[in-house]
A protein has these predicted regions:
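Conserved "HGTGT" condensation-loop signature of ketosynthase/thiolase-family condensing enzymes
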Residues: 1-133, 145, 153-157, 168-314
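Short-chain dehydrogenase/reductase
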Residues: 148
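Membrane-interface segments at transmembrane-helix boundaries
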Residues: 137-138
Length: 314
């Protein structure tokens, strides 16, 4: 079964579309969710969830699945897969500080739902009426690409006709304290992925085709496995984040490299989704694939990769 990307949503301070991930604005203010999706439903939601609402809304509309009347397909046909490593860290830290300084009884009842790791995936599903399988990944360096993989797996396994895949990381004091002061993207990206047949049935355009996914120890071995599955060298390589270890110059020599982290900040759990969105933007700007999206260096517990192709090259 061929799985395609039929919708993309990008909500970053310096980029609001897939092509802008390749050519971002020089400066921009932080994302203000109420300006994008209105105030309704934002109260008591943490920043990660608010950003996720914005990216989900953009992706579903871009895919033709959402309009002013709501979801245009049965909610049970849409799975929700989200990825974030730091999403509700500020809520957890605030709750722990309250317990340490006072007692558990002093905690906020409004904060309690946000303490669940699944709050992003569940909140987005409830807001948009997505009643298919619901997954939340907090899986370190490879989390975003893992989310894309599991969304494709749900589709290939017949559990859903399509899936919304979302990656988000907020920027706040708790996250910066945890990451040693590193600036995160303070934004989100979302993809709608579905079977080629499903997209064709509703007249949706395929913006990219998802190829094979690989995961294991070592970035070099990950790239070798991707090369075997594609049978070709990539035209563009989306680099993993290099906080823990640099990517050797000897890997994929001569291939153009694109480092989203260098441009936008620490992507962490959102990186893989951002990379796939950037690949779609590259195809839209006339690029010819394949594009390798990779996450995790040799210093991480694993490396992962996905190859994407433009629809015309599939």
């Amino acid at each position: 079964m061929t799985v395609v990307v039929s919708g993309v949503g990008v909500v970053l301070p310096r980029a609001r579309s897939a092509p802008e991930l390749l050519a971002p604005a020089a400066e921009a203010p932080p994302v203000e969710p109420k300006d994008l999706v209105g105030r309704k439903g934002l109260r008591y939601k943490d920043r990660a969830t608010q950003l996720a609402y914005c990216a989900a809304d953009a992706a579903l509309r871009n895919a033709g699945l959402l309009d002013g009347g709501g979801l245009r397909v049965p909610g049970g046909t849409v799975a929700m897969v989200a990825s974030s490593n730091y999403g509700n860290l500020d809520t957890i830290c605030r709750a722990m500080d309250t317990i340490a300084e006072h007692t558990a009884a002093a905690g906020s009842a409004m904060d309690l739902p946000n303490a669940s790791s699944n709050v992003i995936a569940s909140s987005v599903a409830i807001r948009f009426g997505l009643r298919g399988p619901n997954l939340m990944l907090c899986n370190g360096a490879t989390s975003g690409l893992d989310a894309v993989h599991w969304a494709a797996t749900l589709i290939r396994g017949g559990r859903a006709a399509r899936a919304l895949v979302l990656g988000v990381e907020p920027d706040n004091e708790s996250v910066r304290a945890f990451t040693g002061g590193s600036r995160t993207i303070d934004g989100a990206a979302a993809l709608v992925v579905e079977s080629e047949e499903s997209a064709a049935e509703r007249g949706a355009s395929a913006q990219a085709v998802l190829g094979d996914y690989v995961r294991g120890a070592g970035l070099g071995r990950c790239l070798e496995r991707l090369a075997r599955t594609t049978g070709d060298r990539p035209a563009l390589w989306q680099l993993p984040e290099q906080r823990a270890a640099a990517v050797p110059d000897t890997l994929l020599e001569g291939v153009d490299r694109h480092d989203l982290g260098e441009v936008f900040g620490l992507g962490s759990g959102a990186l893989g989704v951002l990379q796939c969105a950037a690949a779609v933007g590259w195809f839209a700007r006339g690029g010819a694939g394949p594009v390798y999206a990779t996450a995790g260096t040799d210093a991480d517990d694993a490396s992962a990769g996905i190859a994407l192709r433009g629809r015309a090259a599939a």
